[in-house]
Design a protein with these regions (language model features):
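An acidic, glycine-rich, mixed-charge low-complexity segment common to nucleic-acid enzymes
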Residues: 1-64
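A short, basic-hydrophobic beta/loop patch
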Residues: 2-7, 11, 80-130
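Short alpha-helix boundary/capping and kink motifs at helix termini
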Residues: 38-97, 109-110
Length: 130
């Protein structure tokens, strides 16, 4: 099994990609706040299996072109970018949002579900006032 290596910081284009996804579920003001919070957040680590469980997303198959591309990167010893997460809220039924990096999470899971994935994570806007 190939070991996943990770970059120390998200790629610059990960933030606009996260904003694009978030534009489907959040207001422009919320998106701007979330992106700034993600940029300022320290790196944390969570397991691939836990990210998928908390997000409620299904594991994409290994033959998904984007997942396969990330698996190939790992096998070629290329580092993957940390993922960007918005923390869910269990009490309100809000799941974790993988704002950027879903395919990387799936690729990592296929290689080892216990992979510790570096991420930047911030609270859901619903929790920000608490």
């Amino acid at each position: 099994v190939s070991k996943v290596t990770w970059k120390s910081e998200p790629d610059p284009h990960d933030y606009p990609a996260a904003a694009s996804y978030l534009s489907l579920i959040a207001t422009t003001d919320q998106i701007n706040d979330l992106i700034e919070q993600l940029k300022a957040a320290p790196l944390s680590h969570y397991k691939a299996k836990d990210m998928l469980r908390a997000s409620g997303l299904r594991l994409l198959p290994q033959d998904n072109p984007h997942v396969a591309a990330d698996v190939t990167k790992v096998k070629n010893n290329k580092a993957l970018s940390p993922v960007l997460l918005i923390r869910g809220d269990l009490a309100h039924g809000i799941t974790l949002q993988i704002a950027d990096g879903y395919h990387r999470v799936c690729a990592s899971y296929h290689l080892d579900e216990n992979t510790d994935i570096p991420c930047r994570i911030t609270n859901h806007p619903h929790n920000a006032a608490r």
